[in-house]
């Protein structure tokens, strides 16, 4: 049996509804919520050691790029980072992904798809933590 995944959702009230939190929990996730503030989010990441963090690119205190930088600089276990934003550009997307994001979602997006993506990415991360390195993974395109 796979371990329960821990997900931190960093969003203002109303952005991530109770229904979506319940949907995650019904699929076996432990959900922790924090208001959209990067400084508060960093405290939760340090305390909770989540498997997945869903956060907006722009937050009070510290933005998503800053959060990912601090996690790396402090040597904290790296969660799967899912970044949400209201707009996109190729340069911005490249910067976010290079900073350590695992997925970048442009709003509006389907919460069902994000929930599915959380479990897909968390499963891949668990597989990697069980001894398979990224260099062991191969993609074959036919």
Summary of predicted features, one role per range:
Residues 14-33:
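Two-component/phosphorelay signaling modules centered on CheY-like receiver
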Residues 34-52:
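Acidic, metal-coordinating helix/loop segments flanking the phosphotransfer/catalytic sites
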Residues 37, 63-66:
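Acidic catalytic/metal-coordinating carboxylates
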Residues 66, 87-103:
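Alpha4 helix (beta4-alpha4-beta5 surface) of REC/receiver domains from two-component response regulators
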Residues 91, 109-118:
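C-terminal output helix
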């Amino acid at each position: 049996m796979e371990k329960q995944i821990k997900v931190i959702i960093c969003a203002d009230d109303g952005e991530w509804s109770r229904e979506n939190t319940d949907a995650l929990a019904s699929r076996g996730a432990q959900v922790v919520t924090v208001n959209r503030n990067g400084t508060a989010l960093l405290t939760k990441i340090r305390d909770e050691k989540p498997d997945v963090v869903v956060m907006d690119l722009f937050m009070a205190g510290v933005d998503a790029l800053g959060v990912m930088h601090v996690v790396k600089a402090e040597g904290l276990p790296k969660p799967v980072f899912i970044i949400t934003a209201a707009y996109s550009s190729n340069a911005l997307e490249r910067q976010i992904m290079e900073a350590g994001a695992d997925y970048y979602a442009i709003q509006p997006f389907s919460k069902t798809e994000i929930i599915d993506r959380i479990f897909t990415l968390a499963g891949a991360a668990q597989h990697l933590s069980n001894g398979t390195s990224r260099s062991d993974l191969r993609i074959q395109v036919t």
